[in-house]
């Protein structure tokens, strides 16, 4: 019996090491040449909870690598995904025409963004392969120069890449802008052994892919991804150029999610994928931008957003919290405070911190290790409950460690794919909250109903007023 129990326990431990309660369907590395269609495609990849963007490489094409890097980094920064690695392919000799629409259309704040210290794409890709063991889709939104470079220089690439998805704007495999950027790489890639899925652009037949109705619907979605694409259509240079309304490289994002909406013809290791369902594809854009590509919850389908569902004192703030901070923070906040059994400010801070960390890396739940320095003594330790719910990093999953240092701190470290950041509540915010709680405790005492009523009232106010992008210091540890 003892031997059986020992084997059983070892089996459980091993299962814990290798199991995962939920994983996205697609792990991707994206290569881009900086086109505005690439911006729409990348935004869609980032918006989908069923896709994990592990890294982005930039190569010459529509823009030079340096300018493409600036566009990509400014886009990621504007979406608060600063932790996604971006590398540069400087090997390709193609001289970019620097198309004005792509060059002049902003993706985010470019001030302070420079390609000077950007990592080499091969080094970056190699580091991704060393940490992520799930097979990857390598997506080429421009040329296949970077893909070919990786194939030549990373010996075990075939063990890590299950397919290449390449956007082709030509009528065949051997023509079009993306093919001609690096003809040698294109020709060699089409002859190698790993599957290549060649995704065609949507052929308009006198119909714009992004018609007025689709653009209108995108503008009503009210999240940071839809707002970024709406800003493109609102910009003077893009909205007055017909290319903005075509469905080109963003077909890669749609194909990854909805391959049945394409006519797929396979010959050898090459599959030609042609968009075929216009209505379905337009609806697919909306679904992706809304994040409706996978169920986010385990038991309930969705939490109501109707204020009347909630307690009377929080009803006036429901819509504002969701509009300002998104449905993820709202849902995590509701669940964390139900778990916590009272509405507390440090539980709310923990939720905001966890969502901010997930944003930084663009991860889902259960995907990184967290170490909390909030200790085990309330009220600061209440932050741990918010962290657990918002990140899925729980003690039961072995993903949350609580440090009991002599002096606790409203901070936590998050480690994902050999990268670590530390988030700390800004001192002035921490002092304001702590002083307020101490004063309420001094006046009313912890056993007073008035104390807990005022804590609840203040917690709702902090939930509504504290922006997670403004209240934390974010430090890169490594």
Language-model features, listed with the residues they occupy:
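Sec-dependent N-terminal signal peptides
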Residues: 4-13
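C-terminal segment of classical bacterial N-terminal signal peptides
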Residues: 14-18
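N-terminal acidic, glycine/proline-rich low-complexity segments
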Residues: 20-306, 394-395, 477
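Short, N-terminal intrinsically disordered low-complexity segments that are rich in Pro/Gly
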Residues: 58-65, 243, 322, 339-347
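Hydrophobic alpha-helical scaffolding
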Residues: 175, 179, 243, 343-344, ...
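Active-site nucleophilic cysteine motif
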Residues: 245-254, 342-352
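Non-transmembrane, aqueous-exposed alpha-helical and coiled segments at domain scale
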Residues: 260, 293-343, 349-478
């Amino acid at each position: 019996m003892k031997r059986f129990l020992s084997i059983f326990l070892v089996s459980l431990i091993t299962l814990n090491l290798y199991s995962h309660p939920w994983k996205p369907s697609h792990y991707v590395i994206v290569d881009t040449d900086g086109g505005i269609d690439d911006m729409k495609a990348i935004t869609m990849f980032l918006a989908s909870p069923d896709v994990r963007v592990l890294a982005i490489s930039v190569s010459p094409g529509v823009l030079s690598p340096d300018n493409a890097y600036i566009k990509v980094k400014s886009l990621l920064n504007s979406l608060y995904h600063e932790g996604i690695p971006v590398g540069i392919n400087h090997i390709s000799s193609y001289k970019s025409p620097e198309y004005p629409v792509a060059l002049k259309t902003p993706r985010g704040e470019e001030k302070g963004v420079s390609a000077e210290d950007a990592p080499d794409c091969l080094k970056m890709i190699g580091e991704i392969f060393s940490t992520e063991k799930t097979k990857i889709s390598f997506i080429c939104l421009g040329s296949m120069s970077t893909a070919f470079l990786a194939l030549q220089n990373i010996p075990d690439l075939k063990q890590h890449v299950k397919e290449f998805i390449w956007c082709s704007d030509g009528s065949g495999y051997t023509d079009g802008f993306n093919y001609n950027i690096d003809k040698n790489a294109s020709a060699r890639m089409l002859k190698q052994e790993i599957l290549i899925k060649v995704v065609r652009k949507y052929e308009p037949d006198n119909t714009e892919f992004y018609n007025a109705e689709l653009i209108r619907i995108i503008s009503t979605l009210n999240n940071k991804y839809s707002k970024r694409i709406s800003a493109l259509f609102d910009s003077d240079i893009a909205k007055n150029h017909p290319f903005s309304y075509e469905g080109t490289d963003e077909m890669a994002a749609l194909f990854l999610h909805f391959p049945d909406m394409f006519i797929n013809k396979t010959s050898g290791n090459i599959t030609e994928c042609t968009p075929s369902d216009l209505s379905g594809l337009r609806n697919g854009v909306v679904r992706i931008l809304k994040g409706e590509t996978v169920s986010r919850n385990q038991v309930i389908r969705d939490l109501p957003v109707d204020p009347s569902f909630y307690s009377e004192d929080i009803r006036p703030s429901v819509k504002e919290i969701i509009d300002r901070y998104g449905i993820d923070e709202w849902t995590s906040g509701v669940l964390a405070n139900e778990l916590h059994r009272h509405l507390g400010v440090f539980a709310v801070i923990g939720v905001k911190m966890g969502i901010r960390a997930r944003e930084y890396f663009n991860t889902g739940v259960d995907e990184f290790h967290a170490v909390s320095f909030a200790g085990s003594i309330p009220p600061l330790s209440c932050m741990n409950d918010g962290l657990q719910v918002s990140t899925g990093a729980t003690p039961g999953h072995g993903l949350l460690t609580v440090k009991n240092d002599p002096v606790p701190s409203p901070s936590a470290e998050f480690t994902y794919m050999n990268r670590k950041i530390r988030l700390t509540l800004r001192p002035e915010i921490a002092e304001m909250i702590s002083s307020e709680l101490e004063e309420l405790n001094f006046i009313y005492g912890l056993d007073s109903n008035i104390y807990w009523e005022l804590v609840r009232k203040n917690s709702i106010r902090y939930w509504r007023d504290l922006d997670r992008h403004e209240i934390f210091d974010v430090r890169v540890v490594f």
